[in-house]
Swiss-Prot record:
The gene is CRSP1. It comes from the Eukaryota. It comes from Canis lupus familiaris. Its main location: secreted. GO terms for biological process: adenylate cyclase-activating G protein-coupled receptor signaling pathway; regulation of cytosolic calcium ion concentration. This is Calcitonin receptor-stimulating peptide 1.
């Protein structure tokens, strides 16, 4: 019911805005007076336009990155540095064996595996 009271004011407001916009429009020009050169721009205008576009693009990208960081901030898991050398792979496999052994209540970790095994073998070779 309130809509019928509001709609005449809405229509009058739209008409008033339309008339104001129409009256403020640029006056008509004759075809002989100063033909518009909309396709021709000087180099300075192009530089300013390019700078404005790049600035807006950078602001948009930084805003997107900030939003991604906010959403991923709660989901970020700690990642260890990966190592593909033979020593790292051997220690990784030893860790897997140790975990598998602890699940089965048996220790499957070989006696030659552990902390600084690689350095101990070097010392034995030098001696």
């Amino acid at each position: 019911m309130g809509f019928w009271k509001f709609s005449p004011f809405l229509v009058l407001g739209i008409l008033a805005l339309y008339q104001v916009g129409f009256l403020q429009a640029a006056p008509f020009r004759s075809a002989l007076e100063n033909p518009p050169d909309s396709g021709v721009r000087n180099e300075e205008e192009l530089r300013l336009l390019l700078a404005a576009v790049m600035k807006d693009y950078m602001q948009m990208k930084t805003h997107e990155l900030e939003q991604e960081q906010e959403t991923e901030g709660s989901r970020v898991a700690v990642q260890k540095r990966s190592c593909n050398s033979a020593t790292c792979v051997a220690h990784w496999l030893g860790g897997l064996l140790s975990r598998a052994g602890s699940v089965a209540n048996t220790n499957l970790l070989p006696t030659s595996m552990g902390f600084k095994v690689y350095n101990r073998r070097r010392r034995e070779l030098k001696a």
